[in-house]
Design a protein with these regions (language model features):
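Crotonase-fold acyl-CoA enzyme core
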Residues: 271-390
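Conserved CoA-thioester-binding segment of acyl-CoA-metabolizing enzymes
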Residues: 6-11, 117-219, 237
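Hydrophobic/aromatic residues within transmembrane alpha-helices
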Residues: 172, 209, 230, 301-302, ...
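Long, compositionally biased, glycine/small-hydrophobic-enriched stretches that function as flexible linkers
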Residues: 1-142, 155-156, 262
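C-terminal long alpha-helix characteristic of the crotonase
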Residues: 4-50, 310, 314, 364-411
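Glycine-rich beta-to-alpha active-site loop
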Residues: 44, 48, 59, 73-108, ...
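Short alpha-helical scaffolding segments that buttress acidic/His motifs in well-ordered protein cores
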Residues: 346-347, 395-399, 437
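A structural preference for short, pocket-lining loop segments at secondary-structure junctions
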Residues: 172-173, 190-268, 281-282, 287, ...
C-alpha cells in the first residue's frame, strides 16, 4: 500500500517541491515585488491543487496507512507528523511550522492552509472522517493525570478555567479576566481538559459553564460569558489552526454534544469509567449561564448546550462578517435552532440578539432578571436538578442523533476545515486583524 501511495504521490510531490523552490528563492514576505508574489501564488496554488486531487482519490488509503487501518487513534498533531513522514511534502513538517511560529499572522507563509487541505481531504472520506472525529473524543492526557485529584478534592485550577464539583454539577468557570474571557489556544486546551473531567467523574451528573468576573476596566467586577476569539492573539499569529480552530470543533465542543470516548490510542479503556455496553461514549447534559454577552465563539457554544440561561441585560452576536472567519459549526446549527432568516441576519449581517427580544427565546431557554444577583444562580440550580433526572441522558442522546447525525457533521467539517484555513490567511482578514489588534 505504501509503495502504491508513493507512486501516486510522485506528480503532486513535484508540484509541492517546485513551490518550495520558488519560496526559497524569494526575500522576506514584506520585501517581495508584486511579480514575485504572483509567481509564488501560482506555484502554491498548483501544489495545493495537486494535494487536493491526490487526497480526493487516495485520502482513505493515506489515513488507513497512518492509523493501521483505523486500529489506532491519533491526535491532530500526531496525524500531521505521521503524514509528513509517510509522504514528503503532503503536509508541512514540524520544522517548517516552527519557522512560522512567532511571526505575526500577516507575516506567515500560510502553511496552515496546507494542513487545512490535508484535514479536509481526510474528512471528505466517510470512514476516515468518522474515525478522525472519534479520535478527538478521547480524554486528554492532562485530564487523566488530574482525575484522581479532581475526584478527591472536587476542584482543579486549569489556569484559564476553574472546575469545581458542587452537588451533582461540575461548574466550569472561564477565568481570562483581562481579555473579557476571549478564547485563545490556552483556553481551548483548558476547556478540553475541563469537559473531560466533568464527563469522567461519576459523581457529576450535569455540567455548567459560566464566565468569571472581569478585571478589564470597562467591565470590572462583572461576569462575562465570552468575547469570542482573542483578536490580539489572532493578529500576533498566536491562534493556531490545529490547536484552536480544529481542536475546538472536533474536541471539547463535540464532547459536549456527543460525549467522551474513554479509550486510549489503541481503543483500550483508559480508566475504570467505561461507557455502558449499549453506547461507546459517556454523555452528560450541559447548562450555559450567560452574563453580559456571548460574542462570536461564545454564542457558538450555546448551540451545543441542553439548557441556556441568560441574564436580562445580556446579548448574543456572531460578528463573522466583521472578523472575516467562519463561526465554527454555527452555520450548521443556528439555522436548525432559530431558522434560516434569523441565522442569515446574525451570521451575514452581524445582528445582535438581546436577551429581552422575542427572538432570544429561540436560543435562550430562560431569561432572568439581571437586577437580582441571585436569579441566575437560582435558575442554574433548578436546571441542574431537572437535568440530573435519569431519563434525560437517553433522550438527549436520541435528540442528538435526530438533529445532527455524525455523517452530517463530518460533511460540514470537511468543508469547514478547508475554508476556515483559507479565511485565516485571506487579505481582508489580515487587514482586519491589525485593526482589531488593540482590542481584547
Amino acid at each position: 500500500m505504501t509503495a502504491a501511495l508513493t507512486a501516486a504521490w510522485r506528480d503532486p510531490r513535484a508540484l509541492a517541491v517546485h513551490a518550495e523552490e520558488v519560496l526559497a528563492g524569494l526575500p522576506h514576505k514584506a520585501d517581495r515585488t508584486p511579480g514575485q508574489r504572483a509567481r509564488l501564488d501560482a506555484a502554491t496554488d498548483d501544489a495545493r491543487r495537486g494535494r487536493t486531487a491526490f487526497l480526493a482519490e487516495h485520502g482513505q488509503a493515506v489515513y488507513d496507512a497512518l492509523t493501521g487501518n483505523r486500529t489506532r487513534y491519533l491526535w491532530l498533531d500526531e496525524l500531521l507528523d505521521a503524514a509528513a513522514e509517510l509522504l514528503d511534502g503532503l503536509v508541512p513538517t514540524r520544522e517548517q511550522m516552527a519557522a512560522e511560529a512567532g511571526r505575526a499572522q500577516a507575516d506567515k507563509e500560510g502553511r496552515e492552509i496546507d494542513q487545512a487541505v490535508f484535514f479536509s481531504g481526510v474528512l471528505r472520506h466517510e470512514r476516515a472522517g468518522l474515525h478522525l472525529m472519534e479520535s478527538l473524543l478521547r480524554p486528554t492526557d492532562r485530564a487523566l493525570a488530574l482525575l484522581p485529584e479532581f475526584t478527591e478534592r472536587g476542584s482543579v485550577d486549569l489556569g484559564r478555567l476553574h472546575v469545581e464539583r458542587v452537588g451533582d454539577a461540575a461548574h466550569l468557570t472561564v477565568t481570562n479576566p483581562d481579555a473579557l474571557n476571549a478564547e485563545d489556544n490556552d483556553l481551548i486546551a483548558a476547556m478540553d481538559v475541563g469537559v473531560d473531567l466533568a464527563l469522567l467523574d461519576d459523581r457529576v451528573k450535569v455540567g455548567v459553564l459560566r464566565g468569571g468576573e472581569m478585571t478589564h476596566p470597562r467591565h470590572r467586577g462583572r461576569r462575562v460569558f465570552s468575547a469570542g476569539v482573542n483578536l490580539r492573539h489572532l493578529d500576533a499569529g498566536r491562534i493556531s489552526y490545529t490547536d484552536f480552530l480544529l481542536r475546538r470543533e472536533l474536541g471539547y465542543l463535540s464532547k459536549l454534544q456527543r460525549g467522551l470516548l474513554p479509550v486510549d490510542a489503541s481503543g483500550d479503556p483508559v480508566t475504570s469509567r467505561k461507557a455502558h455496553w449499549s453506547t461507546p461514549t459517556v454523555q452528560k447534559p450541559w447548562i450555559a449561564a450567560v452574563d453580559s454577552f456571548a460574542i462570536g465563539g461564545g454564542m457558538q457554544l450555546l448551540f451545543a448546550f441542553d439548557r441556556v440561561i441568560a441574564a436580562s441585560d445580556a446579548y448574543l452576536s456572531l460578528p463573522a462578517a466583521q472578523e472575516g472567519i467562519i463561526p465554527g459549526v454555527a452555520n450548521l446549527r443556528l439555522p436548525r435552532i432559530a431558522g434560516s432568516r434569523l441565522a442569515r441576519q446574525v451570521i451575514l449581517s452581524g445582528r445582535r440578539i438581546h436577551a429581552t427580544e422575542p427572538e432570544a427565546r429561540l436560543i435562550c431557554d430562560t431569561v432572568v432578571d439581571a437586577a437580582d444577583p441571585a436569579a441566575l444562580d437560582t435558575a442554574v440550580a433548578a436546571a441542574v436538578e431537572e437535568l440530573a433526572a435519569p431519563a434525560v441522558l437517553a433522550n438527549r442522546r436520541m435528540l442528538g442523533l435526530a438533529e445532527e447525525p455524525p455523517s452530517v457533521l463530518r460533511a460540514y467539517l470537511a468543508e469547514f476545515a478547508l475554508h476556515q484555513g483559507l479565511r485565516l490567511y485571506a487579505p481582508d482578514v489580515l487587514a482586519k486583524t491589525t485593526k482589531f489588534s488593540g482590542t481584547s
